[in-house]
Amino acid sequence: MTFRNCVAVDLGASSGRVMLARYERECRSLTLREIHRFNNGLHSQNGYVTWDVDSLESAIRLGLNKVCEEGIRIDSIGIDTWGVDFVLLDQQGQRVGLPVAYRDSRTNGLMAQAQQQLGKRDIYQRSGIQFLPFNTLYQLRALTEQQPELIPHIAHALLMPDYFSYRLTGKMNWEYTNATTTQLVNINSDDWDESLLAWSGANKAWFGRPTHPGNVIGHWICPQGNEIPVVAVASHDTASAVIASPLNGSRAAYLSSGTWSLMGFESQTPFTNDTALAANITNEGGAEGRYRVLKNIMGLWLLQRVLQEQQINDLPALISATQALPACRFIINPNDDRFINPETMCSEIQAACRETAQPIPESDAELARCIFDSLALLYADVLHELAQLRGEDFSQLYIVGGGCQNTLLNQLCADACGIRVIAGPVEASTLGNIGIQLMTLDELNNVDDFRQVVSTTANLTTFTPNPDSEIAHYVARIHSTRQTKELCA
């Protein structure tokens, strides 16, 4: 038997993990084992919301060392993280300033300023990326306006996964899928857009040309002295998750469900027309030249904050209590900027309901019900937008990532969208990370080949839409009201 041992470092906004994958060539089987899991979260430092990158690096090294201590020969390592955030380095490779997190308020007002000065359509035609107030484009503008004293010291700007790869290898890389999340990459050239960079205040010399997934960045020398290749995987965690989504046919959509929910479909060409701009659709880079045509949805961040504020440790019990409540009594827009990082999420949700003359969710279960119903309804709206954009309805939706374990939300999604939902795999980002490593090692041919492996090894659960559910009736009433308004307009 021929085995490959690949390590995936998968960092999310709330947790990180070092996972060992064992691939058996002859039977094309893939197994995952968790080596080390650790917390991640926001910190307050010198008036900024930041990431503790030193702690994350220590956790990564601890996980890698654990694998080596077991005497396992590692064939390759790959790192994926969330998008848009970056670390600044000087000429000696030392950090400049703080690793500020995207939920910091320093970018307030800058997106509107960019649209006014550069033109919303021009920015979109150049980048193909949706407008989010924390995109790297606006973060860099905030940095250069608010901390000009740092600029003379900056030699390099590395996005998060590239920074951690650099810390392991001493080699710098700017991986393409994550680079596209910055809103600074030109969608036609796949290189940094000089006009957008100029507006941001950043120097183009801070960046190298983006590289596509599948190249070896450098090598990590393990404690035993072996040189282990560090591969540039699809380093945006959503890009990795999409690679591991067992999409079947052209009418399949995906939903990567975690702190963020990212709903979309794969395409060989981007969508940058006026319809896409009006819907704020993004065209992020994927593996093999594919585009991830999708929309960001605030996701389970709202629930994570409620769990933290209310000190709730038993999520299954909360979901059970939530399931017993009637649907659609409290509806909010999860994508409202007010929910990006409020002082207290519970109060913000209650205020949003109060301002729209709805009942106020008071109990933990009512707050969770509000979040789940609101997310499912937003999923339905976004899926409809995506279908209109491409001119064809979807026949099935694949939900991947940690959020796919929430069976209540999966069923609500199926009912609200009126579509069959297939949930799994849970560790999609990790698997997609491993998939690119196996392709780089010449064990697999391409993404479609890898998806066949995922389909046969992952635990997948199907949720059939129930047209008689409360949320399905609610959606039907909304559609009827919309059609009446359109006819009367």
From Swiss-Prot:
Q: Which organism is it from?
A: Escherichia coli O9:H4 (strain HS)
Active site per database record: 237
Known catalytic reactions: L-rhamnulose + ATP = L-rhamnulose 1-phosphate + ADP + H(+)
Q: What subunit structure does UniProt give?
A: Monomer.
- UniProt pathway: Carbohydrate degradation; L-rhamnose degradation; glycerone phosphate from L-rhamnose: step 2/3
Q: Which cofactor does it need?
A: Mg(2+)
Family classification: Belongs to the rhamnulokinase family.
Q: What is this protein called?
A: Rhamnulokinase
Q: What does this protein do?
A: Involved in the catabolism of L-rhamnose (6-deoxy-L-mannose). Catalyzes the transfer of the gamma-phosphate group from ATP to the 1-hydroxyl group of L-rhamnulose to yield L-rhamnulose 1-phosphate.
Disulfide linkages recorded for this protein, renumbered to the chain, are 68-222, 353-370, 413-417
Top enzyme class, one word, equals: transferase
Concerning SUPFAM superfamilies, the annotation shows:
Actin-like ATPase domain
Q: Name one Pfam family in it.
A: FGGY_C
Q: Which GO terms describe its cellular component?
A: cytosol
- The EC number on file is 2.7.1.5
Q: What does the entry list as the binding residues for substrate?
A: 83, 236-238, 296
Give residues annotated as binding ATP: 13-17, 259, 304, 402
Q: Which GO terms describe its biological process?
A: glycerol metabolic process; rhamnose catabolic process
